[in-house]
């Protein structure tokens, strides 16, 4: 198996000012491409330190990836360090400089004087296009080894690395499928599938669970066993397909928006304890404007009454966190927006406000098109966890409703 190493560059990483998300992403991706990552190091913005690390690791690995230090400032030293170790010159690429300037002009009225540094290319390097930012990457081949320079911001690095994956894939590459579920507990899912998952030794099985993505069943094997894994997935879906919301990188909100488009339905949401979180998830999806009418954050009882038409009598008898309240919230929202489907959420996120009858974590979610589908939940966790789980469960219920489930 080929070996790889990663050098993440930036004093801000050493000082703990930002998380090293690039290392996590690259380690996962390189494993899937058939590399064994033998070292991940973090180096500050220092020419000697970067150079020494590059020199040392080039003796040990087949692939070396450096992230960060490709900006225009004097402390962006990655290009200089790699050129120094390889004893190659840095040359200004005028064509590249013009492209960088054109990109900057779209967002800024003035072009920084030091921008030329981003157009310095190591002799013999292939320039890698950055579709998001202004700092291009570079790729070099050195005695059969590959050296790749990528920018530090993950939103720039990820698409640039993804564009290289086909070129970097090795004979030891892995094939992986991730199946995502939300409303089924991890233990229940595993029990349903144990005869399929654990009666073989060809596919590596891992389950992970959190309050954002739910339960993820990760299935991994070597590329030569792709057909075996695909057949295994079919058997799994025969048993659990109704619970599945996504595969691999699919997000719940993306699935819901796609279903709304397919069914030509519009959506509006009324939120209390989630404070706009559900609306935010929906509008994060490109093209959501085709189906999303809008949202109302009615945190106080006054707004619930005056904007959504919740009756004073309902609030007095049942409280804001109740089946009756969320149903009146969706009814009022439908009158207000005219959306086909309305969803409302009201709950107690804590840490205070709970009672014996309605402890912290009590949440009501209502879906209303022609009739009400109302669910009560008792979530656990801190305030942010309860709010996140509430928004995600609203999406899960909506997904099931749009798929035509009798129950959500």
Swiss-Prot record:
It holds the Pfam family MoCF_biosynth. Coiled coil: none annotated. Disulfide bonds: none annotated. Signal peptide: none annotated. SUPFAM superfamilies: CinA-like (SSF142433), Molybdenum cofactor biosynthesis proteins (SSF53218). Belongs to the CinA family. This is CinA-like protein. It comes from Thermotoga petrophila (strain ATCC BAA-488 / DSM 13995 / JCM 10881 / RKU-1).
